[in-house]
Amino acid sequence: GIRHLSWVHVDLFNFHWTKRYFKSNKHEKKCYELMDDVIFVSNDAKNKFQQLFNVTTSTKVIYNLIDCKTIVLRANEFKVEKRKFTVCLVGRLVRQKQFDSIIRVARIFVDNGYDIDFWIVGAGCLESDLSKMIHDLHLDDNVHLLGYKPNPYVYIKCADLFVSCSLAEGFSLVVAEALCLGKAIVSTKTVGPVELLGSNSEYGVLADNDDESLYNAIKLFVNDYNKVFVYQDKAAKRSLMFDVEKTMNEIYSIL
């Protein structure tokens, strides 16, 4: 017969965006319990979900499909020039991604005498708000909204550091992609990146979800470029966890 599957891509405990579609948590839980399997993109996403719903349904973790070979090929399609130490961020310009936080962090850097570039790749409903914020904080020379790019990998590869400052992530595709490209990474402590980068910052540096923590984490790399090389090496090792064939077999096994 037909199997019913539900795929959970986000930390619903901290970012319960589905709430408005149900009368109550009890009704939402009931829907999940009608499924044959509930699939999660990370162990942490699953644990947070169970904190919220504690369903009795069969649950499984299958990482998002990450094709490192293709990502590396695409990253080499063309080159972009950078002028100075460059931090790259990629994502939709929406509240969950907290790009306003990185703009405030950029201001702290400028106030402390640093001259670094921040590239924000992506489009979304907050574009004009963020653009105004950059202008109001006199950061037009340091923070650049690059808009939607069909090939963001080129920008990630070219930058010195990749940063994710999200409020909530289930897996964080873009952090995984940055690992494939062997980038030094700083991320806020959301469930996906904690799992990908290691809870003790083994493969990338984790920061608390506030401007000062993010500033201090990025500053580690700006002040000591050797740290960039160290974490590039760690990222390349970590990217070996992504295996297309293994992930596809896991998906086929539940269909």
Regions found by a protein language model. Give the residues of each.
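Membrane-proximal helix-turn-helix segments that form the acceptor-binding/catalytic region
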Residues: 21-38
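Carbohydrate-associated surface elements
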Residues: 44, 65
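A conserved mid-protein helix/loop that constitutes part of the nucleotide-sugar donor-binding site
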Residues: 85, 89-108, 114, 118, ...
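Nucleotide-activated donor-binding/catalytic signature segment of Leloir-type glycosyltransferases, i.e.
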Residues: 131-147
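A short, well-ordered alpha-helix in the C-terminal region of glycosyltransferases
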Residues: 135, 220, 227-241
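Aromatic "clamp/platform" in nucleotide-sugar-dependent glycosyltransferases that forms part
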Residues: 148, 167
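Short hydrophobic beta-strand element within catalytic cores of glycosyltransferases
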Residues: 184-187
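Conserved acidic donor-binding segment of nucleotide-sugar-dependent glycosyltransferases
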Residues: 199-212, 220-225
